[in-house]
Structures are given as C-alpha cells and as structure tokens.
Regions:
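Primarily recognizes the serine-hydrolase "nucleophile elbow" in alpha/beta-hydrolase
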Residues: 168-247, 325, 330-340
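Catalytic-loop region of hydrolases
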Residues: 23-95
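C-terminal subdomain of alpha/beta-hydrolase-fold enzymes, centered on the catalytic histidine
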Residues: 372-604
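Alpha/beta-hydrolase active-site loop
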Residues: 151-172, 594-598
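Short beta-strand element of the alpha/beta-hydrolase
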Residues: 64, 80-86, 96-112, 116, ...
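Disordered, low-complexity segments in secreted/periplasmic proteins that are enriched in proline
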Residues: 23-24, 325-398, 463
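Sec-dependent signal peptide cleavage junction
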Residues: 14-24
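Short amphipathic alpha-helix adjacent to the substrate-entry channel of hydrolases
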Residues: 120-140
C-alpha cells in the first residue's frame, strides 16, 4: 500500500510539473519531423530555422540548424521536397550508430562576434564542412547566437539554449545526447571553454529564462575544443603584461606604471591560484633579480613548456625547411607539450623593464556572417591567421612582428637554431637528445612573441577594445570591467569612468563582476574562485595554441589546462602549443578538422 501511495504521489507530482511547464513561460516548439530536407550529395538530412528560444531577444540570430547523417533516419518522401523522418536505430556510419553518435556545436565567433544561424544547407560551418563531420557519423548542431554588441553573457546563453533544445527533442532525434562537444577558435575558443566549464550553472538560469529557453534540460557538454581561447578575462590584462610587457618600448611613465602594476598583480594572482603540475608540485612565482617575478616553479614550468614546443617542432619537421613568412618564426610545425606530462603548455612571462616598483602618480565593427555561411578556415594556417585577425574587430598595433624575422629555407636543424640566435644566443640544442634550453622566458618573448595590443590589452582605457563592448550593456558601447586596473588608475583621469562602469547593473540586475565570472572558465574550474564546483564541467578537453601569438598571454591556455586537469579524477586534457604558429587553429601536424574528429572518437571510446 505504501509503495502504491508513493507511486501515486510521484505521478501526481509529475503531472503538476507538466502542468506548470505548460501554463508557465512558453517553450519552443518541438521539431516537426515532417519537414526534413535532404542533401543527396552528402547524404545528409537537415532542418534550419529551428527556434531554440520561445521569447528570443534577437530572432535574427536565435535559431539553429540540425544536420544528420542519412543512415540515421528512415525517411518517406512527402513529394514536395521534404521528408518525414524517424530514427533508424540500426543505422551505422563509421564507428557510430544512430544511438551512439556524438553531436558537435561549432562556436565561430572571432572577437566574441555574433554568429548567424544557417538559412539553408551550408557546406561550411567555419571549422571544415558539414560533410566532414556527417561522413564520420557525427551530428552537427549549427546554432546562431548573439555577439558582443548584446553584452555578456548573451552569446554563451544562446549556445546553451541551443544545446538544451537538442536535448528537448531527444525523443525525436538520433544521437547520444550525453555526448555533445563544442569547438571554437579565438573568441569562439573562449566561448567553447565557457560552454565546457559552466554546464548547468545557476548564474545562467535567469538569462536562459528571459529568452524562453527550455528549462528542463541540461546544457552541460562532454567535451570542449578550444583553439587560442581569448579567455580568463578577469586577469587577462595582467597576464599579458607579465608575459609580454618586456617587449614594449617607448612607454610613458604612467604607461610603464600600469604595465608593471598589472604584472605584479598577476604574480599575486598566480600565488593564490593553487595550481600544481602533474607531479603535484605547487606552481608559484618568486621575486627575481631581473624583470618582475620571473622566478619560481610556475616560471620554470613556463620555460620548460617553451623548450618542449621547440623540441617537438624539430622532431616533427623535415629539413630542408622553408619558413612560411618573414614575420615571427617557423611555419607549419610542432607545438609543444610538457615534458613527462599528459598535456603540454605554453606560458611565459616577463613584465615591463621596470624594477617592479609602481611609481607614485596622481571600436571595430563585429563580423556578421550573413546567411549562416561561415568562412572555411580549414586550409593553410597562414590563411587562417589572416582571416581571423581581419574579421574579429579587435584593436591591434599596426606592426606586430617580433624582433626576430625568419624567412627562406633552412637546410639543417642547426641552421634553424643559428637563425634563432641571429641577434644573440638564447637557444641551445643538443642534437643527440633533441633537448632545447633557452636562457629565459623573456628572451623568447623578446625574440618571437611581441605584444600586439596596447595597454591594457583587453580593457582599453578609452573603452574601445572588443572586450570592452562585450562587457557593455547591450547598446554596442564599451564599458570597463577590470577591477585590478581600476585600482591602478585611481588618481588619474580614468578613475571615475572605471568606478561608474563597475557599479552599473544589466537588465537582470547584475554588475559586471558577476557577468565576468560567468565568462571566466576558471571561475568554475579553480578552487580559488567561489564558483568552484557550482557547475558540471566537461570531462574531455582539447586545447591548442600558436605559441607566438601576440593576442593573449601564454598563461591563458596553460592555466585553463591545469585547472581542467585538476578539477576531477578522470578528466582528460589534451593540451599542446604549436611552435611557429600564431593566432590560428594551431595544430602540431595534420589538419585541425581531422584532428578534432579523431579526438572526439577517442573521447567516445
């Protein structure tokens, strides 16, 4: 009898929940399974214009397309160009069935730009073609999303809503809904990292509710692929100066003070972050005779990562070798990995040329990828780099070339090392053991990784950087968000503007510190933050970066990788840096698309 009553109560509760769901906020309509279209050349069934938000903030962006391998459906031709489809559970493509197939959601948002949803069958989705994935048995969720002009957390909110919508239709769609993977580059890599770190975070609940997202499904993902993620924005300015401040010249006394002050703040941040290496060694910074806190186990880790990156390049590259360009170093070649660890790194640091003491002193247009047609960056990496920097609307210096310029053909590895040392020896290489040693992280950045952004890199004092717009308030105007920089500018002409912006509230009553936490994967992954263990992070991570990019500090990716690795036992982190590449879909060998697909396959085993 008690069991019967318990069952009846559970049934009544379920009916009550269904009633509340129906009578409360509206929800998106489910997929109409009679409206599928078919691309015979690729054997793909697809639908576009699917609204994942019942009350969208911007309906021109907040729809999605779904692209399904043909074998996963049994289809009946409706005679009007559409098909009625049901899941064919025995359908198989590659190593997957209609039941076990993973799903991917591309995040093609350079500079945190908006991403238009597809309006038809798109051969390209920004990271290779649709058929690159469907031919391997992978289902593609191609969602539009608002961009930086709408203000954080609009973009990630939209991608979360799209993921929830796919799961809302799990009774109709093929695929393993527990195996969704995000992928992105640059600002897209950052938002992919956020999707991976912030699964089911309560901070997003009011924003999801505001657009009428499905509130009964999860937005957590299994894996996150991040190329050159521009993230960890609460400390990004400070990391940039610690890493590349030594490459600046011609700074005023005030500018030098800001650079040095931010570098010092980064050292304090690292020493409170609690990072450890794969052996459990605490990674910290210490004061140094030269530079600003250029010593300690964290510094040694960074230095080792740079050395390993060059070692990988030398082992991977066939000589004679022709450098791809005169700016920077190398071309398509190896990316680094940490010696002895299961993921490598790239990070570095040297602040401004000062002594660590702070002196006493009193916007581009967002890209809009019309009609859902994404540029295909699956070709040569040099082309990718140019494309991203032209499209992302981020302010950079007119000249970003490093002090050392490599071009032409190098007959031997010894010739290449000699070219690296053309302006003074800072690299030695033991040919027998393929062991590289550099004199310092500062020598590396001075030679090959110059700052390409002004002070501060992500938080321009005139509010003109793309990230300023990201933390604006939906009107396309920039706002200040860096609380550390706000302290450094006290007593200057910028003090009032910083104070006013940091106190503003968005439409849901949140100040920028809350929104900054929502857009910081470390907030969820690191025990140093209040958001630790308040989300369901991804179990699989793949992070790649071009080691010579001037777009963000090397610390960005390594801190993310270390925090993700330490979050939970069994978390898989595949992290490497790529020698000779910059701000691009950097890969040590092979193509970014093929390598991503292979990684997904490994995660699914």
């Amino acid at each position: 009898m008690k069991k019967f009553l318990a069952c009846m109560m559970a049934f009544a509760l379920m009916l009550s929940c269904v009633s509340c769901f129906a009578e409360g906020e509206s929800v998106p309509a489910k997929i109409d399974m009679t409206k599928w279209q078919y691309e015979a050349a690729d054997d793909v069934y697809w639908q576009v214009g699917l609204s994942y938000a019942a009350t969208p903030a911007d309906s021109s962006y907040e729809t999605m397309g779904i692209f399904v391998p043909g074998a996963y459906f049994t289809a009946a031709d409706n005679g009007d160009g559409t098909y009625t489809c049901t899941v064919n559970e025995s359908g198989t493509v590659g190593q997957y069935t209609a039941v076990t197939a993973p799903l991917i959601i591309p995040v093609n948002t350079p500079g945190y730009s908006a991403m238009a949803a597809p309006t038809g069958y798109s051969s390209s989705m920004g990271y290779g073609s649709i058929s690159d994935y469907t031919s391997e048995g992978i289902i593609v969720l191609f969602a539009g999303a608002r961009g930086r002009d709408a203000g954080a957390p609009a973009g990630v909110t939209d991608f979360k809503a799209a993921i929830r919508y796919a799961r809302y239709n799990k009774d109709l769609l093929p695929g393993d809904m527990d195996s969704i993977f995000s992928l992105g580059m640059s600002g897209g890599g950052a938002q992919s990292a956020l999707i991976g770190a912030s699964g089911n975070s309560d901070l997003y609940t009011p924003y999801l509710a505001a657009i009428g997202a499905v509130m009964t499904e999860s937005d957590a993902v299994k894996g996150s692929m991040c190329w050159c993620p521009i993230t960890n924005l609460d400390i990004a300015d400070e990391a940039y100066e610690w890493n590349m401040g030594n490459t600046r010249s011609g700074l005023s006394e005030e500018e030098q003070a800001y650079s040095d002050g931010m570098a010092l703040a980064f050292a304090e941040y690292i020493n409170g972050l609690g990072l450890t290496d794969e052996n459990g060694t605490a990674l910290v910074l210490a004061e140094s005779e030269e530079g600003i806190w250029q010593s300690g186990t964290y510094y040694d880790y960074v230095k080792d990562v740079i050395e390993t990156s060059l070692e990988h390049f030398l082992s991977d590259t066939e000589f004679p070798y022709t450098a791809a360009s005169s700016g920077g170093f190398g071309g398509r070649g190896g990316r680094g990995g940490m010696r002895g660890g299961n993921f490598g790194g790239t990070e570095g640091g040297f602040a401004g040329p000062g002594n660590g003491e702070i002196p006493d002193f009193g916007n581009g247009e967002k890209p809009d990828f019309a009609n859902g047609e994404m540029p295909d960056f699956g070709g040569e990496n040099a082309e990718q780099e140019t494309a991203y920097e032209e499209m992302d609307g981020i302010t950079r210096a007119e000249s970003t070339s490093s002090a050392l310029s490599l071009s032409g053909t190098y007959e031997t590895k010894q010739d290449y090392i000699a070219a690296l040392n053309a302006n003074g020896e800072w690299v030695t290489w033991d040919e027998e053991t393929n062991t590289v040693t550099i004199t310092s992280v500062a020598a590396f950045t001075q030679a090959l990784k110059n700052a390409s952004k002004g002070i501060a890199a992500f938080e321009q004092l005139d509010r003109g950087q793309g990230e300023n717009t990201l933390f604006g308030y939906g009107d396309g105007n920039g706002a200040h968000f860096d609380a550390i920089l706000a302290e450094l500018v006290q007593g200057s002409e910028y003090e009032t503007a910083f104070a006013e912006d940091l106190a503003k509230q968005d439409a849901l009553g949140n100040t920028v510190d809350v929104r900054l936490n929502m857009y910081n994967p470390m907030y969820y992954l690191s025990p140093a933050y209040e958001g630790y263990q308040t989300s369901e992070p991804a179990a699989c991570w793949r992070i790649r970066t071009g080691i010579n990019q001037g777009d963000t500090a090397l610390c960005t990716e390594i801190d993310l990788a270390l925090a993700a690795e330490a979050y939970a036992e069994g978390t898989q982190v595949d992290f490497e840096t790529v020698w000779g590449q910059g701000h691009t879909e950097a890969e040590r060998t092979g193509s970014s698309t093929a390598n991503f697909i292979a990684w997904v396959q490994e995660c699914m085993k």
